[in-house]
């Protein structure tokens, strides 16, 4: 028998990587789940979440870059007739290479996934949370948001937006019983760099953080109601230095890590 008193969480980008690990952590900590991704693998991942402890797992294959795709996810959660206790807005997409060498349709897809789709889903779910005066929101930003990202200009720009948006929304909701936390990981061992076409870069070929560790860090921060959390001590040092380093210097440093072929230098 399903226990409807269990909290319900929505996790986006949950088929692989940080989103997958976030959903696992939620399942192990008593949450039921509505999970979404733009690939059929989300249904296979849903089985892992059930084994981890979630009694109810609704898997939604949908395009999170579109309002229609996010409506599909929102309606799937609403159909359960249970309040959403937590929204983990993790879906994101990267894109390497110089901005003028990128296909603009791919540029638009990054912006639509990372920013427009994320904001649209938050707008829908957070309204319900505000009406109930209860809820938790975790937004996956990035330490990339602190750095002008040469050869990752659009991606870093989207993460800078999310990092700032999260704090603004948190302030707007501080009297509403709804917390907003932004998780800011550094390079993490996922399929991100392969999908972004960055395996030949220094950052793509370099050592990365463990996705399970990053997810646990973010989940714990969300449950505490923290404003932000940078995962990993090296990333904490990087963001601290980024705050006092000229933007031009940061962009030049990023070039060394993200320029195509930099893995061979």
Annotate each language-model stretch with its function.
Residues 182, 202-239:
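C-terminal helical subdomain
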Residues 142:
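Residue(s) in the substrate-gating loop at a strand-loop-helix junction
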Residues 122, 158:
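Active-site helix of classical SDR
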Residues 98-111:
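Substrate-binding pocket helix/loop in short-chain dehydrogenase/reductase
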Residues 15-16:
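Conserved glycine-rich cofactor-binding loop
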């Amino acid at each position: 028998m399903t226990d409807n008193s269990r909290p319900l969480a929505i996790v986006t980008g949950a088929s692989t990587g940080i989103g997958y690990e976030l959903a696992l952590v939620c399942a192990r900590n008593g949450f039921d789940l509505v999970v979404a991704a733009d690939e059929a693998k989300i249904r296979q991942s849903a089985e892992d979440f059930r084994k981890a402890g979630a009694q109810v797992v609704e898997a939604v294959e949908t395009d999170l870059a579109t309002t229609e795709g996010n409506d599909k996810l929102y309606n799937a959660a609403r159909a359960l007739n249970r309040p959403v206790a937590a929204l983990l807005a993790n879906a994101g997409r990267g894109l390497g290479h110089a901005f003028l060498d990128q296909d603009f349709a791919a540029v638009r897809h990054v912006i639509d996934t990372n920013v427009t789709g994320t904001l649209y889903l938050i707008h829908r779910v957070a309204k319900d949370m505000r009406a109930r005066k209860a809820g938790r929101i975790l937004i996956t930003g990035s330490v990339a948001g602190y750095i002008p990202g040469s050869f990752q200009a659009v991606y870093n720009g989207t993460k800078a937006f999310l990092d700032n948006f999260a704090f603004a929304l948190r302030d707007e909701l501080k009297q509403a019983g709804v917390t907003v936390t932004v998780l800011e990981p550094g390079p993490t061992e996922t399929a991100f760099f392969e999908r972004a076409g960055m395996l030949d870069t220094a950052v793509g070929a370099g050592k990365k953080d463990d996705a399970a560790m990053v997810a646990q860090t973010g989940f714990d921060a969300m449950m505490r109601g923290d404003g932000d959390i940078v995962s990993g001590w090296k990333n904490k040092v990087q963001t601290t230095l980024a705050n006092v380093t000229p933007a031009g210097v940061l962009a030049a440093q990023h070039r060394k890590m993200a320029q195509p072929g930099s893995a061979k230098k």
